[in-house]
Amino acid sequence: MDKVLNREESMELMDLLGLERAAWGNLPLMRKAYLKKCKEFHPDKGGDEDKMKRMNTLYKKMEQDVKVAHQPDFGTWNSSEVPTYGTEEWESWWSSFNEKWDEDLFCHEDMFASDEEATADSQHSTPPKKKRKVEDPKDFPSDLHQFLSQAVFSNRTLACFAVYTTKEKAQILYKKLMEKYSVTFISRHMCAGHNIIFFLTPHRHRVSAINNFCQKLCTFSFLICKGVNKEYLLYSALTRDPYHIIEESIQGGLKEHDFNPEEPEETKQVSWKLITEYAVETKCEDVFLLLGMYLEFQYNVEECKKCQKKDQPYHFKYHEKHFANAIIFAESKNQKSICQQAVDTVLAKKRVDTLHMTREEMLTERFNHILDKMDLIFGAHGNAVLEQYMAGVAWLHCLLPKMDSVIFDFLHCVVFNVPKRRYWLFKGPIDSGKTTLAAGLLDLCGGKALNVNLPMERLTFELGVAIDQYMVVFEDVKGTGAESKDLPSGHGINNLDSLRDYLDGSVKVNLEKKHLNKRTQIFPPGLVTMNEYPVPKTLQARFVRQIDFRPKIYLRKSLQNSEFLLEKRILQSGMTLLLLLIWFRPVADFSKDIQSRIVEWKERLDSEISMYTFSRMKYNICMGKCILDITREEDSETEDSGHGSSTESQSQCSSQVSDTSAPDSENPHSQELHLCKGFQCFKRPKTPPPK
């Protein structure tokens, strides 16, 4: 390069290129600077034209001289100019052709004498072995495999890598990786004549990205790049024999606690089990109902209005227990999934009970559930009035003769579930009380009401509601050919006639719900309510008993004057029917498992509701008055009447009836104080004299 340009020209060119003098001879760098200065000095770009011309002149001269200097000068000759071999002209041409060759190419071919002497001995000696070429490693040392990722084709991103290469390339890669990825930590370790680079990056990368970057710098040298699964364990192994540290970016290296972050405060998780227990205890089968009820528990117990009123036992009884869990539940993102699992648990438990428990045990469990509810709402923390429910008992007792026997017989029917003797029919005109009694029986036993008036193609999923139910009610079944033209026609009776296998209960039938598999089971027993439609004989044979209802004006008037019965749905409540059974039936009629609780409730009714009070309730019903419009007057003869047991109460009722059976001259039916409205007549109690 010193012969290309003289010193002044070379210095001038480097100044024009804007490079340091030490860069003279770095042709790629000079070429890059030349192109850059061309844009700067070009006249069209607003540059200096003189500098542009001078720089072009010097740079072109340098390029030309460098090209000539690198070409070997062998002389130029043409084959036609070579004279004939052997002539004097050829000898002179050959001499002139060889003048330019370097004399160093001359070789002395004389042999040393010592070589000749040693020839004989050397012929019988073994020639020296050639050095074997050392093969490059194919993988990391085997003792490090447990710390490395062995994935070959993976898009997984990591933040720790290990590179295995030659010692020379490792020195270059150590700096290049540090600059390229701004590594958090990097170290170089000796390994059997080669190097291993261990480094941590602040961001996650694919192994292929690290490998591609390193391959650009390792054209001939071997390179193995892998991700690290156990960072500190690998680093610790590289610091012990047979490895040792050459250099690292942090003095002292890494410590174990660098990879063990401080444990954050343990985040509280929602207790799915606690929510499931609440759903099972309350027998909640509605996902959204359970979701709404549980979200109400997140508010402070002391400020909760429902807990202060104590009118909802499923709330105030569980609020304090579930308060802490409800706060976490309110912030959860999978509330519906939690509630769905809880509801599924309730349905699963019901199915197990249906399979393993007898129907009598299931009814006893249902009675226990109702008694628990009665203990709550009629207890110290409840706000229900026992007299109002006993008013409902009196009203229902006036609905049918011997109502307690009717209910008892129906329970006997659904408990034993005898094939072809499982269904009752409630038939009567509008507002005769059949639906009221059916709703109460449904709530007493537990079950579902079904609409059988749908078209046959839609009836499949309606019947699927009866899966795992104790009983069903086919409500307000419509038919054709009614005597009254006011009654609408429908497909209900025809559909029921097509469901004889369902009503008989002799064989199992397939029931299905949407999004659920078919369930094969005996269809549950129950009852049917309808208006005065004609019933085919084939369907009539499926009913073990038919009760004809008739509307009673005094019941309607009494109900209108006692609005609390409708507002609180007392007449449709299973608690009312259970109180009716407790009031009229003997303890022996109940299951032995609940007889002790029945005795407690009989004693409570004796202490709070006297026979006089109950008789006044029935009298007000017959008069069409408000049932609780009772004048409280104390009299030893009437107030002492109480009924310590059901047998006693029955004897008192019979004595009361015997009073009414006196001759007509004493108590004629035409008198104002005597009532006979389609049930057992009784005499109005005499008004006791004042104290």
Curated annotation (Swiss-Prot):
Q: How is the cofactor bound?
A: DNA helicase activity requires Mg(2+).
In this entry, the residue ranges of the DNA-binding region are 141-256
Cofactors (names): Mg(2+)
Record GO biological process:
DNA replication; symbiont-mediated perturbation of host cell cycle G1/S transition checkpoint; symbiont-mediated suppression of host innate immune response; symbiont-mediated suppression of host JAK-STAT cascade via inhibition of JAK1 activity; symbiont-mediated suppression of host type I interferon-mediated signaling pathway
Question: Positions modified as N-acetylmethionine?
Answer: 1
- Its chief place of residence is host cell
- Segments carrying the region annotation (Disordered) are 117-138, 634-670
**PTM annotation:** Phosphorylated on both serine and threonine residues. Small t antigen inhibits the dephosphorylation by the AC form of PP2A.
Q: Where is this motif: Nuclear localization signal?
A: 127-134
Q: Which residues carry this modification: Phosphoserine?
A: 114, 122, 125, 661
- Where, by residue number, is the motif LXCXE motif? 105-109
Give positions of the T-ag D1-type zinc fingers.
Answer: 267-359
The alphabetical list of record keywords is:
Acetylation, ATP-binding, DNA replication, DNA-binding, Early protein, G1/S host cell cycle checkpoint dysregulation by virus, Helicase, Host nucleus, Host-virus interaction, Hydrolase, Inhibition of host innate immune response by virus, Inhibition of host interferon signaling pathway by virus, Inhibition of host JAK1 by virus, Interferon antiviral system evasion, Isomerase, Magnesium, Metal-binding, Modulation of host cell cycle by virus, Nucleotide-binding, Oncogene, Phosphoprotein, Viral immunoevasion, Zinc, Zinc-finger
Q: Which residues bind ATP?
A: 428-435
User: InterPro entries per the record?
Assistant: DnaJ_domain, Helicase_SF3_DNA-vir, J_dom_sf, Lg_T_Ag_polyomavir, Lg_T_Ag_Polyomavir_C, P-loop_NTPase, T_Ag_DNA-bd, Znf_lg_T-Ag_D1-typ
Annotated compartments: Host nucleus
Query: Where's the SF3 helicase domain?
Result: 402-562
Q: Offer an example of a GO molecular function term for this protein.
A: zinc ion binding
UniProt EC number: 5.6.2.4
N6-acetyllysine modified-residue sites: 683
Enzyme kind, highest EC tier: isomerase
Where are residues bearing Phosphothreonine located in the sequence?
A: 126, 687
CDD domains from the xrefs?
A: DnaJ (cd06257)
Fill in the subunit field for this protein: Forms homohexamers in the presence of ATP. Interacts with host HDAC1. Interacts (via LXCXE domain) with host RB1; the interaction induces the aberrant dissociation of RB1-E2F1 complex thereby disrupting RB1's activity. Interacts (via LXCXE domain) with host pRB-related proteins RBL1 and RBL2. Interacts (via C-terminus) with host TOP1 and POLA1 allowing DNA replication. Interacts with host TP53, inhibiting TP53 binding to DNA. Interacts with host preinitiation complex components TBP, TFIIA and TFIID to regulate transcription initiation.
Protein's name according to its UniProt entry:
Large T antigen
Q: Which organism is it from?
A: BK polyomavirus (strain AS) (BKPyV)
